[in-house]
Structure formats: C-alpha cells, structure tokens
C-alpha cells in the first residue's frame, strides 16, 4: 500500500502551518491516517540542522553550505519519517520540501538549478510529492505577517528582492508542472483560503483510498 505525499509551499507569512493543520483535521475526520511534518526538520537530528540554518549569526553562511545542510536534513527526514509513513499508506502533509530549495537556494540565492536537481536525485531517488499546494501572496503582505509573529529568523531577515525571487521561483515551478501544483491565493482572509482547500478534499480522499 502506498500513501499520499502532499507538500505545502510558499513564501514567509503564507499560512502553510495553519492550513496544514486544517487539511489534517479534515482528512482525519474521514478516517485517514495523517502524518504532519516539516522541513527543514521533522526528526530530532534534522531539527538540530534546522536550528543551524535559521539562527541569525555573525558569520555569513556560504550558499553551498546552506544547500548541503538542507539536503542533509532532508535525507534524515526521508529515512526516518516520510518513506516509512508512505510505506504504511499514510497521507504525509509536509510544510516545505524540495520546491522550497529551488525557490530559496535557487531563486533567492541564485544557485545552479542543475546542482539542486543533482542533489534532489541523489537524496530522493525518484520520490516526488503527489501534490504540491503553493500558498501565494504578495511579498509585502507575507513579510508584514512574518514580522508580526515576533523575532525574525535568518531567512526572514532577507530583503524584498530576495523574496520576490523566491516567489517567482515558486510560481515558475507551478507553471511548468500544472498537473502537480495547485496555487492557493493566500492573500485572502483565512476563511476564503480554507474554502479553497475544501474544494480539494474529495479528490484527496479518493487518492488516499487508492
């Protein structure tokens, strides 16, 4: 039995975590096993790598170092959480996955997409999400929401130009593979966003039941 791998992507302040919980609640109400996880992180070791990636420090992190840390955390996450959950038939809802690497390290940092793709294949093999939800909103709204949450992490401290590149990278990936991606207008009030998610539930239930 093979599970269903759904990733939630988008820039800062897009509401991915809140809406991941909402989707999980709806699927569990229908009797579906749901595993909630996130990247970077998802296991104790991967969460320690997350701390290194997000903590503001005086030393400038080399973009290649950042990229390798992201994939190191992902390798552990896949081995310990994602692959076992999918193998037993669960629905995995993951807050960020490799699309964020293409957006942040590729779009934001300007790293080679070919290099990212090579690491993607090395770490993931042929595993790709079954469905990716892109929670999209204007950069200024997302940054205002992130600032309202309190102390900013190392990525949230980046400037508007960085986040415009991140947003554009997400949208380009969705445009290039419309069969896998669904864009959600995350600039709407939460109730409207969740109404958009409600329209996806019947299809998700059908997919999760094979």
UniProtKB/Swiss-Prot annotation:
Q: Which E.C. number(s) belong to this protein?
A: 2.7.4.9
List the Pfam families hit by this protein, alphabetically: Thymidylate_kin
One BP annotation, GO:
dTTP biosynthetic process
- Entries under PROSITE patterns matching the protein: THYMIDYLATE_KINASE (PS01331)
* Binding annotation for ATP: 10-17
Entry GO CC? cytosol
Query: NCBIfam families this protein is in?
Result: DTMP_kinase (TIGR00041)
Give the family this protein belongs to, as stated in its UniProt record: Belongs to the thymidylate kinase family.
How is this protein named in the record? Answer: Thymidylate kinase
The gene behind this protein is tmk
């Amino acid at each position: 039995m093979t599970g269903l791998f759904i990733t939630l992507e988008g820039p800062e302040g897009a509401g991915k975590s809140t809406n991941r919980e909402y989707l999980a609640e709806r699927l569990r109400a229908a009797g579906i096993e749901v595993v909630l996880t996130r990247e970077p992180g998802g296991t104790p070791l991967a969460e320690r790598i997350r701390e290194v990636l997000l903590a503001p420090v005086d030393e400038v992190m080399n973009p290649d170092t950042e990229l390798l840390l992201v994939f190191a955390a992902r390798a552990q996450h896949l081995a310990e959480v994602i692959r076992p959950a999918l193998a037993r038939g669960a629905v995995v809802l993951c807050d960020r996955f490799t699309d964020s690497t293409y957006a942040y390290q590729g779009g934001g940092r300007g790293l080679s997409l070919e290099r990212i793709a090579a690491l993607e294949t090395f770490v993931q093999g042929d595993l790709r999400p079954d469905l990716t939800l892109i929670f999209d909103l204007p950069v200024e709204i997302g940054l205002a929401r992130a600032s309202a949450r309190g102390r900013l992490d190392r990525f949230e401290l980046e400037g508007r130009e960085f986040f415009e590149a991140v947003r554009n990278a997400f949208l380009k990936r969705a445009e290039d593979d419309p069969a896998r991606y669904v864009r959600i207008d995350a600039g709407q009030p939460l109730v409207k966003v969740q109404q958009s998610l409600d329209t996806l539930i019947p299809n998700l239930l059908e997919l999760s039941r094979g």
